[in-house]
């Protein structure tokens, strides 16, 4: 289900239309869709607030490096650490088919 190309800070990524994001009791939950809400055999995926900010930014308009830079500016964190966290999260999301490269 994963992409052949490695996840990179230079690439732009987009959310899959096969997942619906909903805020439930303070958490963002990604719900798999297929023929209706929650029909796929895959579990829902919960994101913390930072992960939710990454998810919202994955619209193909900014590279992952730009997303990480915006998060570092917004949260005052160390850019290198945020880049590692963004890469780790997006690698998981790509592996589960929740996002894909904007050029795919």
What are these regions (language model features)?
Residues 2-9, 36, 40-104:
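Long, charge-rich, low-complexity alpha-helical segments
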Residues 1-26:
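Hydrophobic packing positions characteristic
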Residues 26-32:
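A short glycine-rich, His/Asp/Glu-containing loop-to-beta-strand
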């Amino acid at each position: 289900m994963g992409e052949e190309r490695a996840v990179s800070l230079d690439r732009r990524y987009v959310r899959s239309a096969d997942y619906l994001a909903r805020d439930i009791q303070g958490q963002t939950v990604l719900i798999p869709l297929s023929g209706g809400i929650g029909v796929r055999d895959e579990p829902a995926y919960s994101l913390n607030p930072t992960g939710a900010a990454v998810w919202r930014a994955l619209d193909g308009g900014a590279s992952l490096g730009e997303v990480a830079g915006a998060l570092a500016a917004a949260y005052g964190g160390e850019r290198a650490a945020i880049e590692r966290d963004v890469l780790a999260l997006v690698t998981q999301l790509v592996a589960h088919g929740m996002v894909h490269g904007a050029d795919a």
